C-alpha cells in the first residue's frame, strides 16, 4: 500500500517541488530556505535576515550588522518584524503572521546537487500554490493552552496547519486522504514532525544545510527555516 500511495501522491504533487536549472532543465527541490523579514527602525525599509545578518562564508549569524539600505548598525532586538495578512480558508478568517520569504533552493538535476537564489519562476510557483485551495481535508485545530504550545501566538502561528508551508501541508493532506492502514498513518505522523517550520537551517562542518532540525523539546520557529521536500 505504501508504494502505491507514494506513487499516486508524487504524480499529483511533484510539480510543487520543481525549479529551473541555469540551462532551463527542470530540477527537483531538496529543500528551500525561508528567512525572517524585519523593518529597519531608522529608514523603515524591509530587510531580509538571510541577506543582511548572515556571513555565508564564515557560516555565522551576526549579532550586529548594517542595514542594507541606510547602513545603520542593527541587531535583532532593535528591529520590528514585517507582517503579512491573508485569508485563511481553513479558519474562514483573516490572519496576520510574521513574514518569511524563500531565499535559497537546494535542488538536484540528474543526481547532481545545486544551489540557487530564488527567482521569479520559483516565486510564481509558490504564489500559485498559496492561492489554490487544498482539495483534501487537513487538521486545523487551535493549539492547546500552554507556555510552549502558545509561544508562537505573537507571530500568528496559532493553529496546527500554520506550522507547515502550503505545499507540504497539501502533500500531507493527500497522503492522509489516500492512506487506510493505521501503520501508515503513524509513519506519516513521524514524517510530519520533520517537515514543519521548526526545522532550523544551520551551518555545520563547513556546510550550510548540514545539521539543523527542530530545537528539542520546543516549538521554536527559527529565523532561517529549512523547508524539506516531503516527497524526498
Where are these regions (language model features)?
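Nucleic-acid modification enzymes, centered on SAM-dependent nucleic-acid methyltransferases
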Residues: 1-232
